[in-house]
Amino acid sequence: MTLLQTIIISIVEGLTEFLPVSSTGHMIITQNLLGVPTGDEFVHAFTFIIQFGAILSVVCLYWKRFFHIDHTPVPADETCTFKKIIHPIRFYWLLFIGVLPAVIIGLAAKKSGLLDWLLDSVWVVAIMLVVGGIFMLYCDKLFNKGKEENQVTEKRAFSIGLFQCLSVIPGTSRSMATIVGGMANGLTRKRAAEFSFFLAVPTMAGATILDLHDLLNGDSSWASAHNLIMLAVGCVVSFIVALLAMKWFVSFLAKYGFKWFGWYRIIVGVIIIIMLLCDIPLNMVD
């Protein structure tokens, strides 16, 4: 992989990781356009490293939430002993509940080989971009009824986690699934988006650890000095771009909603489908 390919793919990852347009789908399309072999061991390592870089931007932007113990008094009307005990670390407890469904479904998909098959299919990406785009045109009217005082509860966290399971299908978008899941549970767009960011950290960190384990136990011939430098460059680029994209996205979503993202998804998906139907090669690089 060249330096230019590294930078382009990392920018795409950073821009799309937290937008409801499917970062995985865009990565697959971009790699095909640039002629990057998706089944290559180094490309696999590069993919999860730059995703990890993007996820680190959440911890950086919201570090006060991730490294803060709640010392506020337990609500006077709280009678559950367990909730009283976990009150100082309730933030982490909600993330644990939210990530459970994805862990179960993700491991099942990986063990069955379904995940690898889905990740190699540009058709799946294109179709899901269109389907998700159509849904997003109407989701504001369906779910935008949240009130600012709404809080993430254990029940809501688990429900959002179930929505996140849809993102195992490339082109669906983890961000879209979790934000819509939050709105469906009565949260505002801003509150739902922030919890989506938070939930991405344990979800993607867990996936990165699994991928890293598989990689370290496999063929290490790809780990040349050049490739390791490309990994470092990609991680830094995706981190910076994701940080900027995330700050912009929260304000844009609160003001304009999902409509423009929906149209974008539909346009990109239709273009890819037309190219596939007409046997137009996606590979722009010989």
Spans of model-derived segments:
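Multi-pass membrane proteins that catalyze or facilitate reactions on polyprenyl-/lipid-phosphate substrates
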Residues: 1-286
